[in-house]
Amino acid sequence: MRLKNKVCLITGAGSGIGKETALLFAKEGAHVVVNDFNEESGQETVRQICENNGEAIFIQADVTNPENVKAMVDQVIDYYGRIDVLFNNAGISGVGQLHDIDLETWNRVMNVNINGVFLVTKYVVPHMMKQQSGSIINMSSCIAEIGLANRASYATTKGAILALTKSIQVDYAKYNIRVNALMPGTIFTPFVEDYLSKDPNPEEAVQSIKRRQLGGDLGKPIDVAFAALYLASEESKFMMGTPFMIDGGVVNGKLG
């Protein structure tokens, strides 16, 4: 097992990529800490893990709330004594052209997607420093590398996460802490499915996205989960401050 007895904290693990990653990590022997704002969905992830003889606990917390985050990290340390892997997966989308976005909406996307990563990492890192080990996986996006219409706020956050990843890797490498970023393309999560269903022509919207993929299909949450597993495991011990693309060739095709 690639993560046997590793304590892995995954934010936003109630659905989509976070849930799929939690299930996979548990199969690989990890003690999974499932975090989500939605208690029902988070508990369902834990139920499925335990049903398959894995180990997991659920902690409800809002990643934008410092008190919530500190209490969550303290609870993990009290229960397991350490945190080996942090997957900063929680995030929200932002849709709209810049001139149409109001400040409240802009700040909400910044708060969840940037401040959430900052806060959870801030409270986890001191424990990894004491351990002299750890792997931090931040969720960026291939949108940080290419332009995409109507995604100004979301793209801003994902570019920031990539910069943050590279910067803090320099700070914490001496503590044997690795910090890397996942950069998925369009992944067919429940959120994306719901978003596409609201398009005037859902089928054409799906086909349009598929045409941008060199592989001709949409990604699935498990595709990203396997990449996260690699970054969480010792197999990736020489990857530090690295953007890891799982984009179906979108960036390569765009640049080509």
Region spans (language model):
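Active-site helix of classical SDR
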Residues: T121, T157, T165
